From Swiss-Prot:
Chief localisation class: cytoplasm
Molecular-function GO term, any one: threonine-type endopeptidase activity
Propeptide: 1-12
UniProt keywords, alphabetically: Autocatalytic cleavage, Cytoplasm, Hydrolase, Protease, Proteasome, Threonine protease, Zymogen
Hydrolase found in the keyword field: yes
Top-rank taxon, per record: Archaea
Protein name: Proteasome subunit beta
Length: 215
């Protein structure tokens, strides 16, 4: 039953996250598929859910969009009630609880929640049943993740900066796009530091891709 439902929904594909010494980097490609059909070439898979926190999604687009709206509202309510910003861990825990509460008919998503708070930079991966794990270095999700992991494992170091992390994230997604038919159609990248939330422009991403193609 679950397999039949999964075959009928739009599915996201490849996302990556890096914990850097001065922040976090999150990146995704833009293709959404329905079976062998390319349903969209402009699927949004990175959502800004708090001041310095973002969420990436792999899986069913409808479920991902609903969860992004829900968690954004919950964060605003938290800030009003507590008069402080929630930590990345608190946001990941809330998402974990939401997903676990509907485990008998789950949202078909795999999430990354990353950002910078008073504890520093951190990223959590969350599965469709609500299992949440803090990733201390690199993480990739979706159908292109095996290829992305190969690139990340080879080039990541604990001392990497967000600027170098951006280039590595683009390289990992680009490699996945070349080998995974469900990944493609451009790359979105976000870097988050104590100074703020920065989304790379298409021109900035294209410049990195051009240098990779020449290498």
């Amino acid at each position: 039953m679950l397999g039949e439902i999964q075959d009928k929904v739009y599915k996201g594909t490849t996302t990556v996250g890096l914990v850097c010494k001065d922040g976090v980097v999150l990146a995704t490609e833009k293709r959404a598929t329905m079976g062998n059909f390319i349903a969209s070439r402009r699927a949004k898979k990175i959502y800004r859910i708090a001041d310095r926190v973002a969420m990436t999604t792999a899986g069913a687009v409808g479920d991902a969009q609903f969860l992004a709206r829900l968690i954004s509202v919950e964060i605003k309510l938290y800030e009003i009630r507590k008069e402080e910003k929630p930590t990345v861990k608190a946001i990941a825990t809330l998402l974990s609880n939401i997903l676990n509460s509907v485990r008998w008919f789950p949202y078909f998503v795999q999430l990354l929640v990353g950002g910078v708070d008073k504890r520093g930079p951190s990223i959590y991966s969350i599965d469709l049943l609500g299992g949440a794990i803090e990733e201390i270095d690199i993480v990739a999700t979706g159908s292109g993740s095996p290829t992305a992991y190969g690139v990340l494992e080879d080039r990541y170091t604990p001392e990497i900066t967000v600027d170098d992390g951006v280039e590595l994230a683009v390289r990992a997604i680009y490699s996945a796009m070349r080998r995974d038919s469900a990944s493609g159609d451009g790359i979105d990248v976000v870097k988050i530091t104590k100074d703020g939330y920065f989304e790379l422009s298409k021109e900035e991403v294209d410049k990195i891709l051009s240098s990779l193609r020449r290498a």
